[in-house]
Each structure stands twice: as C-alpha cells, then as structure tokens.
Amino acid sequence: KREKVVIFGNDYPTPDGTAIRDYIHVSDLADIHVKAAEHLVTNQQSNILNCGYGRGVSVKDVLEIANAVNNKPIQTEMGSRRAGDAAMLVSNVSKLHQLLDWKPKHNDLSFIIKTAIEWERKLMENENA
C-alpha cells in the first residue's frame, strides 16, 4: 500500500552505504520459540538467545532481491539516517545452535521475501473481499 520504501541512510560504513541486518523467516523464528519453550520446560533454565542466521544483508541488497522476486520495481526514496540506528546488526547464533540444536529451514533471502510478499497479498485480498 505504500507508494515507496524509504531507505534510511546511505552513508554507513558498509560496502553499499546502507544498513546491514540479519533477516529471518517467520517460520524459523516460530520454530526457535517452540524449541526454546521445550528447553525451558525440560531443563527449568531460561536463556537469552539471538535469533537470526548469523549473516547480514544490506538494505539495498534486500530491495534488489525483492524487485527480482516481485517482478515489479519497488519505488524507493533515500532518507536520512534515523537516530540510534546501527550500521550493522547481525546475530551471534552460536548459543542458539548449541543450546537448542536448531537448524534453519528457510535460510534463503529470496524465499523469505517471496513468502512475505505472498502473505501481504493474501492479507490485502482478504481486506478487499
């Protein structure tokens, strides 16, 4: 529904100047939550875990993949950095893998974006029905 996506900053100390983030598929995130709950019940021990794939992707790269998956260009606008935004946020997932023996099922950004777009389209169809 948005006319364009705002890229907040292109002057970060990253290869393309945009922020880098660790994106995760919602199904993998849900799987982690289930495994964490099972671990808590079994071991009676809570932990703090980083959820992600342990690799970062720039905002520009995400939009390039989204354009390819969507078969339609997403309009973008360059904006200023937001206060407090870090140049790079990538999860250290070693504890997650060690403690929960978790392995990602959807560790492909094209698939993550494709399923997100499909979900949004389904929501819009239901909204317009």
Language-model features, listed with the residues they occupy:
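C-terminal substrate-binding subdomain of Rossmann-fold SDR/epimerase-dehydratase oxidoreductases
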Residues: 2-129
